[in-house]
Amino acid sequence: MTEQKNTNENDLQNGTSKADDDIRYQEVKPVNNKRSGLIGSAVAILVILAIGGGLYYYTTQQATKLRDPDHLLSDNENPGITCALIPTDVKGVEIGHRHFPLNVPFMNGPTRGKDVFVPIDFIIGGPKMAGQGWRMLVECLSVGRGITLPSNSTGGLKSAAMATGATLEF
């Protein structure tokens, strides 16, 4: 797991992988997840066939409802939501243009994937973390909200103070 962490940190820093921080879609709500992954073996390695197809993602296709009907990974036939870091050069991954709202660069953009073969080693935390995706996503969401909500409130307060001529000292 340490090797995966070191490799993924380097890939995230140089832009060859994208971190999973959101599972929003254009028309599909997270509770109605249409993506699924099927564990199978191809060329003697375990892979996940991520079946997507034309959905709009803010990050690469990484959260998928995993199925293992042949019990290649474990005794559990339906491990559940699983997160993986997928390099941007994997066949089947199409990266769109970055968002540019209000002329401010925003690092998220549309990414599409269809019939993407994902090695089992791409699962965040390794194969033992298959099915732990919902917990990971909720933990990441809570950390992000813990940062953005107070900072947005502080920014709003400063803007209001500036507009009304009030002075604030922090």
From Swiss-Prot:
Compositional bias annotation for Polar residues: 1-17
Q: Report the GO molecular function annotations.
A: oxidoreductase activity, acting on the CH-CH group of donors
Q: Which Gene3D superfamilies does the entry link to? A: Butyryl-CoA Dehydrogenase, subunit A, domain 2 (2.40.110.10), Butyryl-CoA Dehydrogenase, subunit A, domain 3 (1.20.140.10)
Q: How does it sit in the membrane?
A: Single-pass membrane protein
Principal cellular location given in the protein's record: membrane
What does the entry list under GO cellular component? plasma membrane
Kindly give the InterPro entries that the UniProt entry links to this protein: Acyl-CoA_Oxase/DH_mid-dom_sf, AcylCoA_DH/oxidase_NM_dom_sf
SUPFAM superfamilies cross-referenced by the UniProt entry: Acyl-CoA dehydrogenase NM domain-like
User: Which UniProt keywords are listed?
Assistant: Cell membrane, Membrane, Transmembrane, Transmembrane helix
**Ranges where the record places region Disordered:** 1-24
Locations listed in the record = Cell membrane
Instruction: Kindly list the residue ranges recorded as spanning the membrane.
Output: 37-57
Per its record, how is this protein called by name?
Protein HemX
Q: Which organism is it from?
A: Proteus mirabilis
Q: Which lineage? A: Bacteria, Pseudomonadati, Pseudomonadota, Gammaproteobacteria, Enterobacterales
- The gene behind this protein is hemX
